[in-house]
Amino acid sequence: MTKGTFSFGRRHTKSHTLCRRCGKSSFHIQKKTCASCGYPSAKTRSYNWSIKAQRRKTTGTGRTRYLKTVHKRFNSGFKEASLAVKKTAAK
């Protein structure tokens, strides 16, 4: 049995599986790290040499659930929820 490049073509097992952080099939099973987002490290993997990849993954490309409401709260001066003052009839 040879151990060189000949045996590289004979592999049938998956080296990568789905990543639980980014969802891509980039999580290396033996290394236990994601090649795409760098999971389980705390910071997301990103490099300046891949500007196009940064554009795909940056803030504003997903649902931006929280950011949608920020401009609305900014206009009202970031007021917290407060009870409305009752208007009593002046006597």
UniProtKB/Swiss-Prot annotation:
Record's cofactor remark: Binds 1 zinc ion per subunit.
- Supply the Gene3D superfamilies for this chain: 2.20.25.30
Q: Which domain of life is it from?
A: Eukaryota
Q: Which UniProt keywords apply?
A: Metal-binding, Ribonucleoprotein, Ribosomal protein, RNA-binding, rRNA-binding, Zinc, Zinc-finger
Output the GO biological process annotations, alphabetical, semicolon-separated.
translation
Q: Which GO terms describe its molecular function?
A: RNA binding; rRNA binding; structural constituent of ribosome; zinc ion binding
Q: Which residues bind Zn(2+)?
A: C19, C22, C34, C37
The answer to whether keyword Ribonucleoprotein applies is: yes
Q: Which cofactor does it need?
A: Zn(2+)
Q: Where do the ZnF regions (C4-type) fall? A: 19-37
Query: Does this entry carry the keyword Ribosomal protein?
Result: yes
Q: List, alphabetically, the InterPro entries matched.
A: Ribosomal_eL37, Ribosomal_eL37/eL43, Ribosomal_eL37_CS, Ribosomal_zn-bd
What does the UniProt record say this protein does? Binds to the 23S rRNA.
Q: What is this protein called?
A: Large ribosomal subunit protein eL37
Q: Which organism is it from?
A: Dictyostelium discoideum
